Amino acid sequence: MRNLKKILALALALVMTLSLMTVANAFNDDKDIDAKYDEAVTVLSELKVFKGVNDGSNFAPKQTITRAEVAAIIYRIVTGDVNDSKAGLYASYAETSFSDVKSTDWYAGYIGYCSNAGLI
């Protein structure tokens, strides 16, 4: 729980620090993003923490976020690895911790990282 609070505090501080930036969302469905979240989505997508769904052209704000997507966001914020270059190193942790995750799944490294860090 303490780690989760640190992660959320870091994310909030990051968003608040960069809140002066004004850039447009790169997502095709940005009109569906609630105005009160638009700035945060813009900043986090510019930082490559949010990468969109499927081919990355949509944000899908009305779609339920999955455990895999949350794990990817947490991984990118905590590690700073927005290029996901080391995420695969944690894939084996996911397979041993969760019966519904295979080491070959696109999200296995993120789930593995969060599991190993005691976040999920």
What are these regions (language model features)?
Residues 2-39, 46, 50-109, 116-120:
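Feature responds to low-complexity, polar/acidic, surface-exposed segments characteristic
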